[in-house]
Amino acid sequence: MTNEYWQGVDQIKYIGHQDKKSGLGFQYYNPDEVIGGKKMRDWLRFSVAYWHTFDQRLVDPFGDGTAQRPYDHITDPMDLALAKVDAAFEFYHKLGVDYLCFHDRDLAPEGDTLRETNRNLDKVIDKIVDYQKQTGMKVLWNTSNMFTNPRFVAGAATSPDADVFAYAAAQLKHSLEIGKRVGAENYVFWGGREGYESLWNTNMKLEQEHAAKFFHMAKDYANEIGFDAQMLLEPKPKEPSTHQYDFDAATTIAFMKEYDLDKDFKLNLEGNHANLAGHTYQHEIRVAREANLLGSLDANQGDKLIGWDIDEFPSDLYEATAAMYEVVENGSIGPRGGLNFDAKPRRSSFAANDLFYGHIVGIDTFAAGLRVALKMKQDGFLEKLVADRYSSYQSGVGAEIEAGTADFKSLESYAIDKPQSELIAATSSDPLEEVKDTINHYIIETLSK
């Protein structure tokens, strides 16, 4: 690197509980500290999202972009694309993360044809690969942007226009080749326009069949070229589509099983997407892990007062603790998963160094959540709580139900003469208020040490 883009920022270190007024530093994330049998960096595998960090201009539906970035003076599109790579790898080094994620169109400008676009992209990938050799920086996942360009107005794999499907397949082919070049550990499919605006003019069955064919083609080509990445589908219920086909984890799992994709694909789950679907982040992770389909996580949060996808940096300790408890229960985020910060500063946080503060709060939030989740797991607090709640299935009629020896006739004989008073007396109170109070206590106590 010839220029220092992020001036005034040194490499960010773990400072523990020093006064945060001392500047940039991690209070809870100590990357090489071993907790729960693994280094924190291996539990969390943090990644920086190229699009939000280096391309995002902080626009919103009511105003122009406010972002001030150290490469804004560069006007030539290819010169700017190459300069962003320098700025990005300086950022990764100073932040101390091990992974990055990107869309193909984050990196280089499009040409008039796909051939020209691929040529531009390859020049940037050459530079990224050189930096990888120098730094050891890895790619958690890459993906293809098939939602921004007007050609994808009605979707890519689900477009009613066969030419658009063909173009999307050709674009994805090159994206998979790039994934192999950079050693991406996963490949993500997020279909923002793979859905519909109105059912009146939509053949929903046909569109979903086309999407499944597209995913099978992608996996087949990855196998053909030796690109051994975990394939991931990312659910989202809406926006920009009125209704997106991969609405949430459960819907996407059903789709995967319907079209025989569940052997090769897992899920990449995002906090804000979970909220838009009417779920907690923990719910979505639980659904995926219990189906053995948890692949990776996008770390961000929504705003309860705002009904759209705002991709805010995560700062909710309670939600992060719940998410990391599911990860601890799973043993890892996924076979090759990590925590990618699909997050951006607020429009009013436009200074370049706000990008560091945003990532620091996100990193510390999930590191804190991991510490609390491991402490709860170590104490067996939730395991005992759940075991006690379902203890009636350990003996008597409950054991018969579990063993599969009970049927409606035997259960009728057991229940038909039981008085209501006996049933009510056998029902235990769920002390949810006590549970939440205890979780608050774990958060406060664990993070105070």
UniProtKB/Swiss-Prot annotation:
Mg(2+) 1 binds at residues 234, 270, 298, 342. Its main location: cytoplasm. One of its GO terms (cellular component) is cytoplasm. One of its GO terms (molecular function) is magnesium ion binding. Mg(2+) 2 binds at residues 270, 273, 309, 311. Homotetramer. This is Xylose isomerase. It comes from Lactiplantibacillus pentosus (Lactobacillus pentosus).
